[in-house]
């Protein structure tokens, strides 16, 4: 990855609210399935904005920090996804998205961020990201002191 895109908590909340507004009316949804771990925080934000209490997870391992590896399903929510929103933080190459589509063919699959290779696999997303960009999510970062350039 040659570029980095830094996401702040404020940006994430703004994007999640924008996505939630597109998913109205909320009564059409039985619940949310968050893709662990990237979709957990966006899933909580959507659940709050839409007033949805039924939240489940599908746990898929596909990244080791910044290296993509073989998909492994650790836990899945039951059913075919009918009436459910499936949320992940991003769609990248589409590997996870293909697995999600196979597990939940009737779900409405959304992400906050989408890269070109995976974009056709989701029903909706908020932000376009170039394919060669690594996204730094706020839950992966800490706030640290940065000394002034002058050293004073």
Swiss-Prot record:
It comes from the Bacteria. It catalyses: GMP + diphosphate = guanine + 5-phospho-alpha-D-ribose 1-diphosphate; XMP + diphosphate = xanthine + 5-phospho-alpha-D-ribose 1-diphosphate; IMP + diphosphate = hypoxanthine + 5-phospho-alpha-D-ribose 1-diphosphate. Pfam families: Pribosyltran. GO terms for cellular component: cytosol; plasma membrane. Guanine binds at residues 92, 135. Xanthine binds at residues 92, 135. The keyword Membrane applies. It is a peripheral membrane protein. Keywords: Cell inner membrane, Cell membrane, Glycosyltransferase, Magnesium, Membrane, Metal-binding, Purine salvage, Transferase. Pathway: Purine metabolism; GMP biosynthesis via salvage pathway; GMP from guanine: step 1/1; Purine metabolism; XMP biosynthesis via salvage pathway; XMP from xanthine: step 1/1. It is found in: Cell inner membrane. Purine salvage pathway enzyme that catalyzes the transfer of the ribosyl-5-phosphate group from 5-phospho-alpha-D-ribose 1-diphosphate (PRPP) to the N9 position of the 6-oxopurines guanine and xanthine to form the corresponding ribonucleotides GMP (guanosine 5'-monophosphate) and XMP (xanthosine 5'-monophosphate), with the release of PPi. To a lesser extent, also acts on hypoxanthine. Homotetramer. This is Xanthine-guanine phosphoribosyltransferase. The gene is gpt.
